[in-house]
Amino acid sequence: MKNMLKLATPLLLALLAGCASWNVPPPLPGESRAAVEARLGRPTNVYQLPTGTELEYATGPYGQATYMARFGPDEKLISYEQVLDAPGFARIKVGVSTQQDVLHTLGRPAEKSYLPIPKLYVWSYRYKESGVWDSMMHVHFDQDGIVRMMLNGPDPAKEERRFFW
């Protein structure tokens, strides 16, 4: 029993630490990067852009939200938003946007795959369609890293299994 308690204690503490960050109020424009990182923790990725720094806070691979904190050259917060939604996906332009553009707009994908016949790389993002439906957006890139198509549909990980296989 003591060994079981020793094993369960770190797991319980990790779960409680994760719960503590769920209800953190969002940072406000004008806050410093240090203040944002102190409040939200270490970002899942940091992007250096010509306009300033961007911090990614992804909840994946099974989360349905990615938050981007964008800072100006003065390291003050310009915007903080959830990007896995219709307005976020609308920023991606088929035939124009690159993998880097998608990474800076939507953050890291939940899944990556390759379709050999059309020779397309696919980045998949889990999200809530209209805030209700468990969905996935699939962004397809050609060999040059240009977006060629975007398809959305139900998230297979959240779909009810109707058959035995």
Functional labels for PLM-detected ranges:
Residues A20-W165:
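Residues within mature, well-folded domains
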Residues L15-G18:
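C-terminal motif of bacterial Sec signal peptides marking the signal peptidase cleavage site
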Residues M1-T9:
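Bacterial N-terminal signal peptides that target proteins for export
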